[in-house]
Each structure stands twice: as C-alpha cells, then as structure tokens.
Swiss-Prot record:
GO terms for cellular component: cytoplasm. Residues 339-379 are annotated as: Disordered. Gene3D superfamilies: Phosphorylase Kinase, domain 1, Transferase(Phosphotransferase) domain 1. Its EC number is 2.7.11.25. The keyword ATP-binding applies. GO terms for molecular function: ATP binding; enzyme binding; MAP kinase kinase kinase activity; metal ion binding; protein kinase activity; protein serine kinase activity; protein tyrosine kinase activity. ATP binds at residues 17-25, 38. It comes from Drosophila melanogaster. Transmembrane segments: none annotated. This is Putative mitogen-activated protein kinase kinase kinase 7-like. It comes from the Eukaryota. The gene is Takl1. Disulfide bonds: none annotated. It catalyses: L-seryl-[protein] + ATP = O-phospho-L-seryl-[protein] + ADP + H(+); L-threonyl-[protein] + ATP = O-phospho-L-threonyl-[protein] + ADP + H(+). Residues 11-266 form the Protein kinase domain. The lineage of its organism: Eukaryota, Metazoa, Ecdysozoa, Arthropoda, Hexapoda.
Amino acid sequence: MVKQVDFAEVKLSEKFLGAGSGGAVRKATFQNQEIAVKIFDFLEETIKKNAEREITHLSEIDHENVIRVIGRASNGKKDYLLMEYLEEGSLHNYLYGDDKWEYTVEQAVRWALQCAKALAYLHSLDRPIVHRDIKPQNMLLYNQHEDLKICDFGLATDMSNNKTDMQGTLRYMAPEAIKHLKYTAKCDVYSFGIMLWELMTRQLPYSHLENPNSQYAIMKAISSGEKLPMEAVRSDCPEGIKQLMECCMDINPEKRPSMKEIEKFLGEQYESGTDEDFIKPLDEDTVAVVTYHVDSSGSRIMRVDFWRHQLPSIRMTFPIVKREAERLGKTVVREMAKAAADGDREVRRAEKDTERETSRAAHNGERETRRAGQDVGRETVRAVKKIGKKLRF
C-alpha cells in the first residue's frame, strides 16, 4: 500500500514539470526533500480510475528503473501522488531540447537496456503489468543522463483485465492496439522497438510521412504494417541492434521477442561494448572473418578465421579478459603482424604467444574496463588492415 501523508506537509511550487496521463506534474517539497507531485483532478470518472490504477500499480513495484513512490495525499477535491524527483528531465527533452547533447551508441544501448530491465520485471510479476505508454517522454534521466527510470503508469494494466480499448500515444502504439485487439506484453515490446529506432535516429517516429502530423496518416501506416525507414538509423549502429528493432516492430505479435530476451541481448551488447562481427577481404583469394562469442563458461572470446581459396582455413582464438582487454588488443596486433610475415607456422606460434599473454592478464584481476573492450574491436580492425598489406600464404 502507498503511504497516506498529510497534505499540509506537501509544499507545492509553481514549477510545472510536465503532464502525464490523467494529471499535471509539479515540483514540491515534502519533509525537506524535493519531490515531484502528480495532481489528479477528479472531474472525470476516467481520470479517477486512471489515478487509482497508477497508485495501485506503483505500490506493487520495486525496481531500480521504475520511478519510486513516496506516498499519496488528498485535500478532499484532488488526489496527489508523491514521487521521487529526477531533475534531469525526460529522455524526450534530451533528444529534442535546446541543448542537443550528443550521445554514443553505447549510451543509447545503456538507456534501452535499463528500460528493457524494467519492462521485463513488470511483465514477470505474479500479476504481469503492461505499461501501454512506452515512449521517451516517460523515461526520466538521472546520474548525469547515464541512467533512466520509467514513469507514468496511468494507462498501465494487468494482463488479466483483457483490455481492448485503444490507449497510449499513437506514434508508439502496436497495430493490434489500434485495431482494438487484446493488450499484451507484446504491445510494450512494439513500443520499445519504436523508441529504440528513435534513439538510433534522433527522429520522431513517422516523421518521414508526407503528412507527419496527421493522426489518420500515422494510424494508417501502423495498421498496414508500414516499416520505419532503417536508412535513417545512424551509421555506427550495430547490425544486431537494427535486427532487434525490426523484430520488435514485427506486425505479428507472436514474432516479437519477449522483454526478457531483449534484456539478455542488450546486456550482452552493452557488456561487450557493442562489438560487431565483421569480414575483411585481404586479397583476391583470402578473407579474414572476425567474430565475437561467449563460451560455455560465460567468458567472451574473439575468433579470427582466414579463409583461403582452395587452401585450408586458419583459425585464431583469443579469450578477452576485461581488465587487460586493451593490452590484449595490442598483443593481437603484434602477434598477427608476425604471423603475416611467416605464414602458417607463425600463425600457430602467434596463437600460443597470445594465449600466454592472456593468461598473464587473467592473473592481474577482474576490474571492469568497458572502454578497453571497445578498443579490442578497434585494434583488431587495424590488425586485419595490416595483414592485408603484409600477409603472404
């Protein structure tokens, strides 16, 4: 249950923070603490129901990526929902505000991962909750824009209600929601996919339409299964993330992944520094294929396969130790360059030398260096380019 507090202890300010489903949100002070307060005006029965639903759901939720409720108050005419105050604003404001801060793919994946964790949690409750309004406006940032929390549960519902009413923000709604079919967790997955596309394009969904502000045009595009333009996605977005977007936005709900699957995939992408498999032609007869894997023990490894026309292929495998990832990348460059000079014999020797270097690295501790993990990919690309100039089999 949400704690009932005395309204006299709540000092509302004039600062307007935004408007959620069913009420305005203002800044306030409660027990010498800055908070956000959602104000519900019960002139309409629908608003009253939304308020009770939001308060009920938030009272059952305890997750680091969901806004925390402090209590509720009433003055007889209106109800007030007291929540933690996150002063850095919404993800929408970050994307489209006046400051226009730049952000990396890694940061976008971090935001998406945190949202996925929260949704996976909501969908896995004993009474699973569907948020029904996933969008950047409902993602609040904190910790110098590094982290986010989902807010505004006014439209949320537990899946046992079998809701068929059209609720949410049109640009982010699933086709089945528009067609008044049953709301399921896969509706949140679709909205998540739309938001992920938005993170990787910094464009409003359906802004490519001839009449992008027409509700009818947007509704028609969604219900017909029209895809958002993938060519608008930033060039450094990993292919795996693009494929995830398309899976989430599949017109068939059954083909969309679960939020738990999405959380797992994004977690692997983020921990690996969004390393991408790639292919590098070295000459007319030789191609280098660099791939990243997780072995049976959960450790990350990098494989470099040299495929040669009418000759046996050669494989080099490198464990990736987090703390020493940067040094490993340099070792890969050095040892592969040696291999390029002498052929197969040196390739095998290089592999042994690199394994020795990695073994030493493993003894130096497990301190996390995410940036170093990215350097492995960059150094590997450089190594392959050097081999393109020097390799002779």
